[in-house]
Amino acid sequence: QMCIRDRENIDLALIQLKNKKTPENTYIFKLKGDDSERSFTDKLATLFSSSDDDKLKIDQQLYMIGYNAGLVLANTKQGIKVQMTSGKVTQLSDGQRLLYSIPTLQGSSGSPVIDEYGNLVAVNFAKLGTTDNFNFGIPEESIKEFMRK
């Protein structure tokens, strides 16, 4: 793999596989208006809504899909299993971060945070102090800007 974009002040990287092929047995999130002819970054951009009706609101339900604590929790007798946790928006985005009450453990950075319709609204990146119930995500507007550069 090769990093094609990164930024020091945002815990986010855009990577591209050298062979440009998705590994087998990998789940790909469906994108709104999926069109196989469009580029990957164009497809990523469709994850984000631009209508005022789609703006996040305080107390709106959010979900995070990931591997809290890595293999410690994910490794089961039936194999590696993902966890889905939920919480609510507790502070609206300031353009750099979105605060929500989704519980996380170490290993959750990079997990997608989605709304009730499956739209990506943030990428999880930090905890607030020692609590596991207030966490920050990189909001969609920062991700869009990151992808444009």
Give residue spans per PLM region.
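Short conserved active-site loop signatures built around small residues
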Residues: G118
